[in-house]
Amino acid sequence: MKLTFLGANHEVTGSCTLLEAAGQRFLIDCGMEQGKDVYENQPIPVAPGEIDGVLATHAHIDHTGLLPLLVRNGFRGRIYATKPTAELCSIMLRDSAHIQEFEAEWKNRKGQRSGAEPVEPMYTIQDAEAAIALFRGFDYNKEVELAPGLVIRFVDVGHLLGSSSIEIWVTENGATTKLVFSGDIGNLHQPIIKDPTYLKDADYVFMESTYGDRCHGPKPDYVGELAKILQRTFDRGGNVVIPSFAVGRTQELLYFIREIKEKNLVTGHGCFPVYIDSPLAIEATRIFKDTDPSCFDEEANALLAKGIDPIQFPGLKVSVTSDESRAINTDPVPKVIISASGMCEAGRIRHHLKHNLWRKECTILFVGYQAVSTLGRSLLEGATNVKLFGESIEAVSYTHLRAHET
C-alpha cells in the first residue's frame, strides 16, 4: 500500500490523494486550487488512464473541480460518492466548466489586441458532462466493494449536503488495514444537515486541519449577529452584499434569514427583499428542497413536519438572467444580495462588489473561508482599492460574520 499526497498538503484548497493498494489506483478527491497560491498542486504521478477510480468526499470544487480535466486527459474509471454529492456535482462541474470557457474567451479577446497567443480553457462543458456520467451514488453507511481487497463506506460528516468521511478497508497478504479520510468536517449544530458522525476505530486517519491551529469558542449567535448587521446597514440606507458559496453556505443563510424574519428581528424595513443572484445557488437550493429528509437534522425535519420550508420565506427573490441580475443594482430599496463566487474570484458577485464596495452605507459580509491570493482574502486583509472589470474601486464597506468562516 502506498499513499501520495498531491494537494492540500500545504494549502487549504486543491485536495487530492493517490492511494495504491490491493492492485488498484484510486484518487481520494480531485480538487481545484482556489486563488493563485505560491505553491502549485503536484502532477499526478500516474497517467489518468491508469487510475481505476475516484472517491469524492463532497461536492465543493476544491475537492472535485479537476475531475473534468482528469477525464479530458484519459481517465475512464468510476467516480464514487454519496447520492447527494453526485447530484450536486452534476450542477457544480457544469458551472465550473462554464467559468473556464468564459475566462478563456475573455483572455483571448483581451490578448488579441496585444498579439498574445490564444489560450484554451482548462476544460469544457463537454469534459464536465463526461465526468458527470462517471459518477456512481451510494447511501451513507453502506459497504461497497471496489475490488477484491478494497472496501469503502461513506459516513456523514456534517460539512455539506452529502459530505462524507470515507472509511477504506485494504486487505493485502491476508492482513486488513483500515484507513479513514476525514474530508472536510462540519461544525456541531450546523443548520439543516446532521452533525458529524464519530468514527470509533482506524489504523490510519488522514484529517483536514483548516482550523487545526486554533480552539473554537462557544457556538456564536449567528442569527442575532446577522440581524444586527442587517439592521445597521438598512438603517443607513445600504445593501448587505454577501459573497457566498452557492452550495451549503447559501442555504444556511436562507435558514438564518427565515428565522430573522419569523422573529421580526429586523424592524422598520418591512418585508425586506433577499436576492439569490446565482443560477448555481438557485439550482443547489432546488436540490436541497428535493433531497430525502433523512439527510437533514431534527430541527429541519421538525419544520418540515409542520409544513414549513426551512429555506423559504416572504421577500425571497431569485435572479436567473443577466438582465434580472443587473436590475438588482437599480433598485434603491435596502436589500440582501447573496451571490457567488464565495471568494469573489468569478461570477456575478464581482458586479455587485463594483456597485456596492465603495458605498459607505453598504456592507460586504464575508461568511466563508477566503483562500490566499483571492479577492475576498485581499479585502479581509485590509485592501483599500481593488480592480474590478478594469476599474479601480475603493473598498470601504466590508466585514465578516464572526466565527462563521469554516
Where are these regions (language model features)?
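His/Asp/Glu-rich metal-coordinating catalytic cores
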Residues: 1-55, 64, 71-252, 258-267
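Hydrophobic beta-strand segments of well-ordered beta-sheets in folded domains
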Residues: 52-54, 78-79, 205, 273-274, ...
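Short gly/pro/ser/thr-enriched loop/turn and capping motifs at secondary-structure boundaries
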Residues: 86-88, 213, 281-283, 371-374
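Acidic, Ser/Thr-rich peripheral helices and adjacent loops at domain boundaries
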Residues: 101-104, 287-308, 375-395
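A short helix-to-beta-strand connector/capping loop
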Residues: 127-134, 147-150, 270, 313-316, ...
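Hard-cation-handling environments
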Residues: 229-238, 244-372
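Conserved small/polar residues in nucleotide/adenosyl-binding loops
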Residues: 399-406
